[in-house]
Every structure is written in structure tokens, then in C-alpha cells.
């Protein structure tokens, strides 16, 4: 056991424990050893590293996350000792070998993940094993339940509704219409959403343009009691913490294993107390799911898992072959959603159609509309301003103020991208549009993004504006323009594709 003086490191490496190389040599420890750092009864597990210059002898360097968990400050004395190897490592290897895991083995993996006993390398091995070997529904059910149980569980009375999209399509701001439509019909819909992970704007990023999203459970219950709905950031709550841990290793690997996709969605809904759920599965070129067949298979798995969890779930397969609406980026999307709530006849058809279709399904699930008539009721609530009024109630209850679409500010710098030829828009790349919007600064720069002047099938002439890039940074705008010229995300083709001559 070593007694060392704390030195706080301003770095974001959660498992790092740094000591002087001479201290390491004179101890029984080796680089990459798993150690327990202890202070006044609190313990954190870390991976040991050494340095000859960054840390003096007798010191221990700890990153901010570890400092916060231990409750230490600069100069405090902590102890380090050898940590036992995680019990779940053999189970991770078992899944790497392609074998089925028992419920208890899955519980151990999730527990040790949440307790900080697994390193990112070990978690990456587990995530990769799921990507390669998958899981059956018994395993997925066990993983979902444990992911929910390791965090906060919210209890409600009566039916609690929610809608969730698996994502992958830019501009998917449907929740800002669906939540107030459903809430205005008297159904309770506490919507928790994520911030952007790989997109230009998550639902929470868009709503945050208008109001607070970092509400506590107590605040959420108050808002829902007052308004029937809310739109908040799930990351501010301790819901299914293992989900956020796995996402952090999925992102750099660029993978999204289906077992984790299913568990991620359902664990958070289970933890939030949802018992009536609609899953949106965008499908098409450039979406996560490419075909109706693939989407139907995923939908059946969501429904089977939901049945096991006693959550009544329906799935909607929606068109995801191009962005939803015309706006991509937090402020631009908030502005477009508000416009749809103010006067839906002036808003993009794709946004309105998707929103009232999804809301209609929820209204039918809630028994406030007969089967087949939910969409009509949803459109009526939108047209009569009921959804707009309810949206403003929710925004104010969450700490914001009433605002109109023309009051939303977007980036002060902008650039129009023009069509190089006459023709028709034959394809819009979801990935390309997202990359350009992010290069412009979205989602961190809430005023950055893209506004599409055209959609697939539109006729254009040479020189017409295809889309406009917005940013609050002149440099970021220039960078986005350069990327736009490389990616060419909107494809325009003439009716004559090629001429074949006799010779």
C-alpha cells in the first residue's frame, strides 16, 4: 500500500492514476496495474501509469472525475492498493467466444461496468463481442433489466406515454410537435431525449434553445403534473447509467450493436416508468436501417422485448432517405418546429406528416381516438392551435418563456450553395448534410446548421440555391464551405444521363 499526496490533473481520462516513475520502481506495482484509490472510506478503481516529469515523488495525479468521486482536494493524502480482477472478465471472454451468457453473468458485467471496475478496453471488448456475436432475446432482456436497475427508477400513476426514434436522419425534430399534440389530448408524455452523439442536433439540443432541459426527477414530475408533458435531457438524470458508458466506447469504434440498441432504448424507458411506447424506425438510403425488411425485423424484436418488460409498444417504419423538414441544427430546427406549431400549412410537409402520423398512433394507443382516426385528431389539435398552446405551457413550466419562430436567432454568417447545372434533385446525403452542419459548429454552436432550399424530386436551374450554411463563426463557415465542395451532399442530375453513340 502506498500513501501519496493528491495532485489534481486537468485532463479527461477517467481511469488514469499517475505516479512518479521512481515511486513505481520502488513499489510492488507495475504499469497498467489495476489499483484502488481510497480516501476516507471512498474508493475508485483506476489504471496505474507513471511519469518522470509530470508528477513528483510522493504525489499521485488524479483526473477531475476521480477527484470529484473521492471528494479529495489538492494536497490530500490518499492510499493506493492492488485491486482484484473483475469477476466479469471471464464472462466477457465467454461472449467473445460466441457463447450465450447466463442472467447472473450479464448482471455481473453491468454491475462492474457501472461501479467503475471495468476499463474502457474491457468495455470495448464486451461491446465488440456483441457486434460480432450478438445476443438472443433472453440475454437482451437480462441486460435491459440490469441497465435500468443500476440507475434511478421513476414511478408514476396510470398510463405514461413516450415516443422514441432510433435516429440516423438529420432534422428529426418530430418530438417538438408530437409531445404537445399528445399532451393537449390529455395523455401524459414525459419525453426524455439525448443530446447529439453523431448528429448535428439531438432533441435536447433543440429544446434547449427555448428552455431548460436539465430538470431533476422532482421537477419533471411537477411539469408533467401541470402540463401533461415535458421535453428534457435524459443525461441530467441517473437513468440506466451503463447506457452512457457503452455509448462512450461505441462512438470511437463506429459501431452500434443491435443488442445494445434494443437495450439502450428500452432500459431508459423502463427506468422512466413508461408503459405505452411508440418506436420510430427511419428507413432508407442514408438511414441506420436501409430496408423495410430490416426495419420490420428490428420492430418485431422491439415488440418482443417490450412484451417481456410489460411495456405496450408499437413501431412505426418511417421514410428516412433524406432529412426531415428543411432545417438542420439546434436553432434552425427550433425555429422550424415553432413555425409548424404556429401555422402548420407554412411548415415542411415531411415534418408535419411524420409528426401527426406518430402522434396519431399514440392517441389511438391512449384510447382518445378510434383506430384509424388518430392522425385526423392529431392534425385537428395542431390546426386549432391546441398543440401550440400546450407547447408554450411546457416551455414556460420548464423555465423558459413564450417565443415566436421569427424571434429565434440563427448564425450571423451564412453562405449559399448553388446548383452547378439544370436538372432534378435525385439524392440528398444524410451523412453529408450532417458533416457539413457539424463543421459549421452544430450542435455546440446552437445557431449553426443548414437550411435546405430543395428536397428530392425538385427541379432546379443552374445557379439556384440548394442550401444555406449558417454559423456564428466566420472561420467555421469557411471550413464548412470547403467541406461542402468536397462532399457535394445534394446530387442534381439532368434527364439525359448518358449518350451512347454508334461508334
Swiss-Prot record:
Residue ranges the record marks as coiled coil: none
Record-linked SMART domains: PYNP_C (SM00941)
Highest rank taxon of the organism: Archaea
PROSITE patterns: THYMID_PHOSPHORYLASE
Binding residue positions for AMP: 168, 194-199, 203, 264, 288
A Gene Ontology biological process term: pyrimidine deoxyribonucleoside metabolic process
Catalytic activity: AMP + phosphate = alpha-D-ribose 1,5-bisphosphate + adenine; CMP + phosphate = cytosine + alpha-D-ribose 1,5-bisphosphate; UMP + phosphate = alpha-D-ribose 1,5-bisphosphate + uracil
GO molecular function, one term: 1,4-alpha-oligoglucan phosphorylase activity
InterPro entries linked: AMP_phosphorylase, Glycosyl_Trfase_fam3, Glycosyl_Trfase_fam3_N_dom, Glycosyl_Trfase_fam3_N_dom_sf, Nuc_phospho_transferase, PYNP-like_C_sf, PYNP_C, Pyrmidine_PPase_CS
Active site residues per record: 256 (proton donor)
Protein EC: 2.4.2.57
A GO cellular-component term linked to this record: cytosol
Keyword line: Glycosyltransferase, Transferase
Keyword Glycosyltransferase among UniProt keywords: yes
NCBIfam families hit by this protein: AMP_phos, ARCH_P_rylase, PRK04350.1
PANTHER family linked to this entry: THYMIDINE PHOSPHORYLASE
Function: Catalyzes the conversion of AMP and phosphate to adenine and ribose 1,5-bisphosphate (R15P). Exhibits phosphorylase activity toward CMP and UMP in addition to AMP. Functions in an archaeal AMP degradation pathway, together with R15P isomerase and RubisCO.
Family indicated by similarity: Belongs to the thymidine/pyrimidine-nucleoside phosphorylase family. Type 2 subfamily.
Protein name, UniProt field: AMP phosphorylase
Organism taxonomic ancestry: Archaea, Methanobacteriati, Methanobacteriota, Methanomada group, Methanococci
Amino acid at each position: 500500500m502506498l500513501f501519496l499526496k493528491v495532485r489534481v490533473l486537468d485532463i479527461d481520462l477517467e481511469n488514469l492514476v499517475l505516479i512518479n516513475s521512481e515511486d513505481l520502481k520502488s513499489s510492488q506495482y507495475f504499469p497498467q496495474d489495476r489499483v484502488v484509490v481510497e480516501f476516507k472510506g471512498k474508493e475508485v478503481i483506476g489504471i496505474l501509469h507513471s511519469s518522470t516529469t509530470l508528477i513528483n515523488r510522493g504525489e499521485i495525479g488524479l483526473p477531475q472525475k476521480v477527484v470529484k468521486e473521492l471528494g479529495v482536494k489538492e494536497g490530500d493524502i490518499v492510499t493506493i492498493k492492488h485491486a482484484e480482477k473483475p469477476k466479469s472478465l471471464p464472462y466477457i471472454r465467454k461472449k467473445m467466444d460466441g457463447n450465450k451468457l447466463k442472467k447472473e453473468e450479464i448482471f455481473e458485467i453491468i454491475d462492474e461496468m457501472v461501479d467503475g471496475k471495468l476499463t474502457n478496453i474491457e468495455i470495448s471488448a464486451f461491446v465488440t463481442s456483441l457486434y460480432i456475436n450478438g445476443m438472443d432475446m433472453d440475454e437482451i432482456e437480462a441486460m435491459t433489466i440490469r441497465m435500468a436497475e443500476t440507475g434511478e427508477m421513476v414511478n408514476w400513476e396510470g398510463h405514461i406515454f413516450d415516443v422514441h426514434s432510433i435516429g440516423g436522419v438529420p432534422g428529426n425534430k418530430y418530438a417538438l410537435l408530437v409531445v404537445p399534440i399528445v399532451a393537449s389530448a390529455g395523455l401524459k408524455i414525459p419525453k426524455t431525449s439525448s443530446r447529439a452523439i453523431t448528429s448535428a442536433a439531438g432533441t435536447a439540443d433543440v429544446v434547449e434553445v427555448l428552455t431548460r432541459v436539465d430538470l431533476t426527477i422532482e421537477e419533471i414530475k411537477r411539469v408533467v403534473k401541470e402540463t401533461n408533458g415535458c421535453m428534457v435531457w435524459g443525461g441530467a438524470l441517473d437513468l440506466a447509467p451503463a447506457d452512457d458508458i457503452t455509448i462512450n466506447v461505441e462512438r470511437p469504434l463506429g459501431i452500434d450493436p443491435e443488442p445494445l440498441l434494443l437495450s439502450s432504448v428500452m432500459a431508459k424507458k423502463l427506468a422512466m416508468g413508461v408503459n405505452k411506447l411508440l418506436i420510430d424506425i427511419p428507413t432508407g438510403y442514408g438511414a441506420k436501417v436501409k430496408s423495410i425488411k430490416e426495419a420490420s425485423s428490428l420492430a418485431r424484436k422491439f415488440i418482443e422485448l417490450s412484451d417481456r418488460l410489460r411495456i405496450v409498444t408499437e413501431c412505426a417504419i418511417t421514410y428516412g432517405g433524406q432529412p426531415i423538414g428543411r432545417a438542420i441544427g439546434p436553432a434552425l430546427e427550433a425555429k422550424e418546429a415553432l413555425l409548424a406549431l404556429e401555422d402548420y400549412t407554412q411548415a415542411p410537409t415531411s415534418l408535419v406528416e411524420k409528426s401527426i402520423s406518430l402522434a396519431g398512433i399514440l392517441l389511438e394507443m391512449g384510447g382518445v381516438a378510434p383506430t384509424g382516426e388518430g392522425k385526423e385528431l392529431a392534425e385537428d389539435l395542431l390546426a386549432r392551435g391546441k398543440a401550440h398552446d400546450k407547447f408554450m405551457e411546457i416551455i414556460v413550466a420548464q423555465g423558459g418563456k413564450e417565443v415566436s419562430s421569427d424571434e429565434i436567432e440563427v448564425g450571423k454568417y451564412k453562405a449559399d450553395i448553388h446548383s452547378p447545372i439544370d436538372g432534378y434533385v435525385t439524392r440528398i446525403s444524410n451523412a453529408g448534410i450532417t458533416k457539413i452542419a457539424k463543421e459549421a459548429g452544430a450542435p455546440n454552436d446552437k445557431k449553426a446548421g443548414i437550411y435546405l432550399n430543395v428536397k428530392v424530386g425538385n427541379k432546379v436551374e443552374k445557379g439556384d440555391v440548394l442550401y444555406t450554411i449558417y454559423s456564428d463563426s466566420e472561420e467555421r463557415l469557411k471550413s464548412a464551405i470547403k467541406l461542402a465542395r468536397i462532399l457535394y451532399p445534394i446530387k442534381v442530375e439532368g434527364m439525359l444521363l448518358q449518350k451512347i453513340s454508334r461508334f
